[in-house]
Amino acid sequence: MKLQANIQTEALLEASGIKKELFCQILSLARKYRVERLILFGSRARGDWRAASDIDLAVSGGDFPRFALDIEEAANTLLKFDMVNLNGPVQEELLDQIWKEGIVVYEKI
């Protein structure tokens, strides 16, 4: 199971253009702030990203304000993050986009 998860993670990183170090930082912060689910969406989930494309993340549960602030400050990247708090009001069109193309990259068990 762990090997399969590692293969899936490597495939996700390659398809999304997110470096492994940055991905590990994102997951570490998700655990720190007790995020329940983290969903990658947008161009990096679809695979049509460009080098300067932002990283779109939908966040469910946990301490969203601190997670969002820390990820901007602590993540070792010049890329921008676009974060959506799924526990707050979200436009229906955006929710549809997240459910349609989103990839769950972290889920608290």
Task: Give the predicted meaning of each segment.
Residues M1-R37, A45-A51, S60-I109:
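Catalytic core of pol beta-like nucleotidyltransferases
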